[in-house]
Amino acid sequence: MSETINTASQFPTFEKPTVQFNEKGWGPCELPDTFKDVPYQPFSKNDRLGKICDWTSTSNNDKKYQNKYASTFGTGNQYSYYHEEDETTFHLVDTARVQKPPHQRGRFRNMRNSRSGRGRNARGGINTHGMTTLSGKNVKARDPRRGMGKKFGNRGPPPKMRESSVAVRADWASIEEMDFPRLIKLSLPNIKEGVDIVTCGTLEYYDKTYDRINVKNEKPLQKIDRIVHTVTTTDDPVIRRLSKTIGNVFATDAILATIMCSTRSNYSWDIVIEKVGEKIFMDKRDHTEFDLLTVNETSVEPPTDDDSSCNSPRNLAIEATFINHNFSQQVLKTGDQEAKFKFQESNPFISEDEDIQVASVGYRYKKWELGSDIVLVARCEHDGVLQTPSGEPQFMSIKALNEWDSKLANGVEWRQKLDTQRGAVLANELRNNACKLAKWTVQAVLAGSDQLKLGYVSRINPRDHSRHVILGTQQFKPHEFATQINLSMDNAWGILRCIIDLVMKQKDGKYLIMKDPNKPIIRLYDIPDNTFDSDDSDDGEGDDGEGFQQVYNYANNGNKI
C-alpha cells in the first residue's frame, strides 16, 4: 500500500496515572497539591438539611432535650467566625437579673407548660374533655390545697384556722356585722383632751441609768414580785361611784384601746357590754386572756400552734406579759428611801390594813365629750414618773418589746442591729406587732402620758423562755409616735362612737362584740342576761365551761381556762 494510516492523530493518547504505593500501610502517602491549605471538618450524611437555620422547628424550653438531635460532627473550630473588635458599635448592656417579688414567681408556669405541650388539653398533657365533673366534696378530697395561696402562686402552707375567743351559742342573736373597710373610713374629729375627775395611786420615779444600756452593756431582767391589778369596769369602786353622777359610757383604757385598734387585730377577742337605761358599761370577761399581750399577731408567719412548745401563741403571750410587768417595775427607783409621787387618793383596789407589795401605777379617771350627749368616763394608767430639770413631773407609760427567736419570727437579730440600726428593728416590730404597739400608743394618749418608754428585752438563749436581758430602751412622745405608725385618733374615736351608737339604739340588756377569728369583721350579738355569770358554771358553761375557748389556740383540743 502506498499510503500509511496514522492513528495517533485521530485518537487521544492514554497517560498512565501516578499510583503511590504505600509500603507501610493503606492509603495515600502524601497530600495532593490541589488539596493543600484546604480546611477539613468531619461530617455525617445523616445531618439534617436545616441544621444551620431551621425556622420550622418548635422551640423547646426544656434544656434536657435541647441537644437531642444535635450532630456529633461539626464541633471543630475550623469554620468558627471571629468578629473583629469594633469600638464604634460598643454598648453597655445591663445583664443584672431583676429579683421578682414572691407573689410573681411562677405565675406563668402553667402557661409555659401549655405551650410546651404539657398543659391541660394539650398534646402530652392532661385531657379534660369528657372528664366527669366531681362533686364539691370530692373536689376538695382530690385537691385539698386548691384555693390556698392564690395570691402567691400556690406557694406556702394553707392558712391556719383560728379558734374564736368565745363559742357562739344558739340563743345568741346577731345584730350587726361591721367589716374593717367600713370601720377604717370612720372619723370623729375635734375630740378634746380628757378632763381628770379622780386621780389615785402612787408612782415611782424612773431610773435614768437604764437609758445607757446597750447590746454590749446589757442588763439581766429581774423578777419583781409585785401585785398588778387588772380590774374590769363594773368591779371598779371608783367607776361605780362616778356612774351615779357623771357620764353615760364607762370603760377602761385597755378596753377602749382594743376597740379603737380593732382594725389592726388578727386574733379573736370579745367585750361584754351592758346597757342599763341610758348608760353603757363595757367589761372584759373574767378568767380570759384579754390582758395577755399578743406576740407577732400581725406577722406574715404567726407563731406555731404546738401547745407543748415554749413558742406557742399562748406561752409567748404569757412570756410577753411577764416581761412587760417586770420591765415596767425594774426601771423604777424602788425602796423605802426613794421619793414617790402620790396622787390625791390612794390605790382603790387595796385597803389600808393590807400589807402587800403593789406595783407602781397611777390611775386617772377621765371624761371625754363625744357629742350627742355622750360622755365617756374611763380609767387610764401611768406606769412611772420622770423628774425634769425644771421640777415638773412627766408621766410615763412603760412597755417592753421582747425577742423570742428571730429565725422563727422572720425578724432581725437584735444583738446585731439594735445599736447600729434601731430603726430597722422598730420597723420590723411594727410589722409583726402592729396591733399591740397601736394599743399601747392609744392607752398612752388617753392617759395623757408625756412619754412612751419602750424597752427591748431578749432571751438569753432562744430555747429558754425563763431568762431574759435588757438590750436597750427608746422613748417617744405618744402623739408623735401615733403619727409615725399611721395611727389616726380621729378614726379611733370614730370606731368607738360607731359601736356606742349601735348599742344605744338597742333595748336594755347584755351584748357582746367579738372579732371574727378568721375574717376582718366585728360582730355585735344580743346575749341573754345570765350569760357568763358564775351561776352557769354548774351547767358546764360560762366562765369555766364551753362558753369560750383559748384566744390564741388554733387546735380544737385546747385546755379550757
Swiss-Prot record:
<dbReference type="Pfam" id="PF05091">
    <property type="entry name" value="eIF-3_zeta"/>
</dbReference>
<dbReference type="GO" id="GO:0005634">
    <property type="term" value="C:nucleus"/>
</dbReference>
<keyword id="KW-0694">RNA-binding</keyword>
<dbReference type="InterPro" id="IPR007783">
    <property type="entry name" value="eIF3d"/>
</dbReference>
<keyword id="KW-0597">Phosphoprotein</keyword>
<dbReference type="GO" id="GO:0098808">
    <property type="term" value="F:mRNA cap binding"/>
</dbReference>
<protein>
    <recommendedName>
        <fullName>Eukaryotic translation initiation factor 3 subunit D-1</fullName>
    </recommendedName>
</protein>
<keyword id="KW-0396">Initiation factor</keyword>
<comment type="subunit">
    <text>Component of the eukaryotic translation initiation factor 3 (eIF-3) complex. The eIF-3 complex interacts with pix.</text>
</comment>
<dbReference type="GO" id="GO:0016282">
    <property type="term" value="C:eukaryotic 43S preinitiation complex"/>
</dbReference>
<comment type="function">
    <text>mRNA cap-binding component of the eukaryotic translation initiation factor 3 (eIF-3) complex, which is involved in protein synthesis of a specialized repertoire of mRNAs and, together with other initiation factors, stimulates binding of mRNA and methionyl-tRNAi to the 40S ribosome. The eIF-3 complex specifically targets and initiates translation of a subset of mRNAs involved in cell proliferation. In the eIF-3 complex, eif3d specifically recognizes and binds the 7-methylguanosine cap of a subset of mRNAs.</text>
</comment>
<feature type="region of interest" description="Disordered">
    <location>
        <begin position="98"/>
        <end position="164"/>
    </location>
</feature>
<dbReference type="GO" id="GO:0006446">
    <property type="term" value="P:regulation of translational initiation"/>
</dbReference>
<comment type="similarity">
    <text>Belongs to the eIF-3 subunit D family.</text>
</comment>
<feature type="compositionally biased region" description="Basic residues">
    <location>
        <begin position="100"/>
        <end position="121"/>
    </location>
</feature>
<dbReference type="GO" id="GO:0003743">
    <property type="term" value="F:translation initiation factor activity"/>
</dbReference>
<dbReference type="GO" id="GO:0002191">
    <property type="term" value="P:cap-dependent translational initiation"/>
</dbReference>
<keyword id="KW-0963">Cytoplasm</keyword>
<keyword id="KW-0648">Protein biosynthesis</keyword>
<feature type="modified residue" description="Phosphothreonine">
    <location>
        <position position="128"/>
    </location>
</feature>
<dbReference type="GO" id="GO:0033290">
    <property type="term" value="C:eukaryotic 48S preinitiation complex"/>
</dbReference>
<dbReference type="GO" id="GO:0005852">
    <property type="term" value="C:eukaryotic translation initiation factor 3 complex"/>
</dbReference>
<dbReference type="GO" id="GO:0001732">
    <property type="term" value="P:formation of cytoplasmic translation initiation complex"/>
</dbReference>
<feature type="region of interest" description="RNA gate">
    <location>
        <begin position="289"/>
        <end position="303"/>
    </location>
</feature>
